[in-house]
Amino acid sequence: MLDQQTIATIKSTIPLLAETGPALTAHFYQRMFHHNPELKDIFNMSNQRNGDQREALFNAICAYATHIENLPALLPAVERIAQKHASFNIQPEQYQIVGTHLLATLEEMFQPGQAVLDAWGKAYGVLANVFIQRESDIYQQSAGQNGGWHGIRPFRIVAKQPQSSLITSFTLEPVDGGPIAAFRPGQYLAVYIRDKRFEYQEIRQYSLTNEPNGRYYRIAVKRETMGSVSGYLHDVAREGDVIELAAPHGDFYLEVTPETPVALISAGVGQTPMLSMLHSLKNQQHQADIFWLHAAENTEVHAFADEIADVAATLPQLQSYVWYREASSEAARSAHAFHGLMALKDLPTPLPMTNLHCYLCGPVAFMQFAARQLLELGITESQIHYECFGPHKVI
């Protein structure tokens, strides 16, 4: 535990941190990658270039300083970050590297005095130990279950199938032929890529799109305009190739009783974790209403439409609707399609307010747009769960 003097010192630095903004974390990352370039094998350098990771770390530092007297308020964020760290196979000694560069950044930018540096050193040590312990537990749980493992494991691409003009799915089986770890519907796999085309190892997380079966995993990858790894998987990776995976991780997953109505709300490639949830609801013989609500630019980029239709044909309580921003005349005539932006108030059957749990995934602006509608309809914040692809943002 931190003493009151340390807490007071940390809180006194909040105005300075707020005034500096993400320039603080930009300096930190520049310093760390200069002195420890091996960490570029872990970090997504695309998120470094666009500033998303700098912003996410800055927000995390400010949140820690703000809630330094109420650390339980940070537990959801700790769990989300620990799950992501576990997918990167983060080790305890790497926290020491981060701590060294964090304190050096504070000294170089602010010259705040030894008392402030000592306080932040203590505070960082407490937080690092929380993460180290939680991640150790996650590693043990992953390795200890049937089919589980720690670190990375080679998998073969046994099927590669275009699902739309932008999204391709990959079915992956373990090279060793053994069983594979179960996962919670909504979780993701970390894919490790080493190739001469890349200066450093590249690690990306992709949501699982099938239900747990003990034999294979399926992911789906959207081709991003500037995406080096998505381009590699779309254009270079072939059936029969071997890639390495970490075990499934993630804090976004389906957690409802059979009597709980569920709304799966997505846009674009954000439907990938929802697919796993939907297949699991079907195979668990879910009893309550299920709403599949998806937004796509047009029919050309709309992935998995046939798969959803097949599920709907065998699941009477499923209501499936799609919104096309650039709808064709054929799509607009469909009884289950709308033209324009998603408007939840236009559903033929209103969403049930009582006990409905809503799962959201897609671009941040879309999730903010959908969440506002849900709140206006009477859904509470506790009924809304969401996943950000990339660094976390609050919707």
Swiss-Prot record:
<feature type="binding site">
    <location>
        <begin position="388"/>
        <end position="391"/>
    </location>
    <ligand>
        <name>FAD</name>
    </ligand>
</feature>
<dbReference type="InterPro" id="IPR017938">
    <property type="entry name" value="Riboflavin_synthase-like_b-brl"/>
</dbReference>
<dbReference type="InterPro" id="IPR017927">
    <property type="entry name" value="FAD-bd_FR_type"/>
</dbReference>
<dbReference type="InterPro" id="IPR012292">
    <property type="entry name" value="Globin/Proto"/>
</dbReference>
<dbReference type="Pfam" id="PF00042">
    <property type="entry name" value="Globin"/>
</dbReference>
<feature type="site" description="Involved in heme-bound ligand stabilization and O-O bond activation">
    <location>
        <position position="29"/>
    </location>
</feature>
<feature type="site" description="Influences the redox potential of the prosthetic heme and FAD groups">
    <location>
        <position position="84"/>
    </location>
</feature>
<keyword id="KW-0408">Iron</keyword>
<keyword id="KW-0521">NADP</keyword>
<keyword id="KW-0285">Flavoprotein</keyword>
<comment type="function">
    <text>Is involved in NO detoxification in an aerobic process, termed nitric oxide dioxygenase (NOD) reaction that utilizes O(2) and NAD(P)H to convert NO to nitrate, which protects the bacterium from various noxious nitrogen compounds. Therefore, plays a central role in the inducible response to nitrosative stress.</text>
</comment>
<dbReference type="Pfam" id="PF00175">
    <property type="entry name" value="NAD_binding_1"/>
</dbReference>
<keyword id="KW-0274">FAD</keyword>
<keyword id="KW-0561">Oxygen transport</keyword>
<keyword id="KW-0963">Cytoplasm</keyword>
<feature type="binding site">
    <location>
        <begin position="204"/>
        <end position="207"/>
    </location>
    <ligand>
        <name>FAD</name>
    </ligand>
</feature>
<dbReference type="GO" id="GO:0005737">
    <property type="term" value="C:cytoplasm"/>
</dbReference>
<dbReference type="InterPro" id="IPR039261">
    <property type="entry name" value="FNR_nucleotide-bd"/>
</dbReference>
<keyword id="KW-0216">Detoxification</keyword>
<dbReference type="GO" id="GO:0046210">
    <property type="term" value="P:nitric oxide catabolic process"/>
</dbReference>
<feature type="domain" description="Globin">
    <location>
        <begin position="1"/>
        <end position="136"/>
    </location>
</feature>
<comment type="similarity">
    <text>Belongs to the globin family. Two-domain flavohemoproteins subfamily.</text>
</comment>
<feature type="domain" description="FAD-binding FR-type">
    <location>
        <begin position="150"/>
        <end position="255"/>
    </location>
</feature>
<feature type="binding site">
    <location>
        <position position="188"/>
    </location>
    <ligand>
        <name>FAD</name>
    </ligand>
</feature>
<dbReference type="GO" id="GO:0071500">
    <property type="term" value="P:cellular response to nitrosative stress"/>
</dbReference>
<dbReference type="GO" id="GO:0071949">
    <property type="term" value="F:FAD binding"/>
</dbReference>
<feature type="active site" description="Charge relay system">
    <location>
        <position position="135"/>
    </location>
</feature>
<protein>
    <recommendedName>
        <fullName>Flavohemoprotein</fullName>
        <ecNumber>1.14.12.17</ecNumber>
    </recommendedName>
</protein>
<dbReference type="InterPro" id="IPR023950">
    <property type="entry name" value="Hmp"/>
</dbReference>
<keyword id="KW-0349">Heme</keyword>
<feature type="site" description="Influences the redox potential of the prosthetic heme and FAD groups">
    <location>
        <position position="387"/>
    </location>
</feature>
<dbReference type="InterPro" id="IPR001433">
    <property type="entry name" value="OxRdtase_FAD/NAD-bd"/>
</dbReference>
<feature type="active site" description="Charge relay system">
    <location>
        <position position="95"/>
    </location>
</feature>
<dbReference type="GO" id="GO:0020037">
    <property type="term" value="F:heme binding"/>
</dbReference>
<dbReference type="GO" id="GO:0019825">
    <property type="term" value="F:oxygen binding"/>
</dbReference>
<dbReference type="InterPro" id="IPR000971">
    <property type="entry name" value="Globin"/>
</dbReference>
<feature type="binding site">
    <location>
        <begin position="268"/>
        <end position="273"/>
    </location>
    <ligand>
        <name>NADP(+)</name>
    </ligand>
</feature>
<keyword id="KW-0520">NAD</keyword>
<dbReference type="GO" id="GO:0005344">
    <property type="term" value="F:oxygen carrier activity"/>
</dbReference>
<feature type="region of interest" description="Reductase">
    <location>
        <begin position="147"/>
        <end position="395"/>
    </location>
</feature>
<feature type="binding site" description="proximal binding residue">
    <location>
        <position position="85"/>
    </location>
    <ligand>
        <name>heme b</name>
    </ligand>
</feature>
<keyword id="KW-0479">Metal-binding</keyword>
